[in-house]
Amino acid sequence: MACSMRVLGIDPGSIVTGYGIIEDCRDKLTHVTSGAISLSRITSFPQRLREIYERLTSIISSYSPECAAIEEVFFAKNVRSAILLSHARGVAILAAENARLPLHEYSPLEVKQSLVGYGRASKDQIEKMTKRLLNISQIKSLDASDALAVAICHLHTARTKERMGIAP
């Protein structure tokens, strides 16, 4: 079966970064792999950033996605948390860029609307729809589920643009 696109979805975090790779095979979404890069809070922040970068680089090398999709930073009440998240997001973007992967960015609202049709969907609703769309019974973590959701959002967006004759 010919697959048209393999996408790496990334849900960045300074303690846990989710990742998920899916393929679009003849308009059927297929789960390739997913998981979470879990880091110790007692490890220094620069070491955690290096670990995120190295693990994502290894995943990219092992699974050869054609592009990456990452969630944008959402509005955060805690400025420090938003800054830490932005650093983690930056090293994830660097891993994709160093692998020469086209990178697509989506807001949490866009991801939720793409999967559930409602921009204020709960994490549980996102996980249930992700499992349904990928025809899998279990996802290792909510972070992996969120990363898979970002990848699905990108494939839905790419399909729509293709059907409309708009370059992705």
Tell where the protein language model's regions lie, with residue ranges.
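Phosphate- and other anionic-substrate recognition elements at nucleic-acid/protein interfaces
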Residues: 1-168
